């Protein structure tokens, strides 16, 4: 499935655009996906599309 984080499964959400006149139209909020190379536990590297928030969490966990 497109536009989904391959680790957490985060995907698009639905919300509204709200104008100054308070008119509401549907819109989609897309996750901030980044294509990065991830080193797996067995030592192989793999390209994955992950959300920026997931990337931040992974960097924080690996620094400990």
From Swiss-Prot:
InterPro entries: Bacterial_rp_bL28, Ribosomal_bL28, Ribosomal_bL28/bL31-like_sf, Ribosomal_bL28_bact-type, Ribosomal_bL28_sf. One of its GO terms (cellular component) is ribonucleoprotein complex. GO terms for biological process: translation. Keywords: Ribonucleoprotein, Ribosomal protein. SUPFAM superfamilies: L28p-like. NCBIfam families: L28 (TIGR00009). PANTHER family: 50S RIBOSOMAL PROTEIN L28, LARGE RIBOSOMAL SUBUNIT PROTEIN BL28A. Belongs to the bacterial ribosomal protein bL28 family. This is Large ribosomal subunit protein bL28.
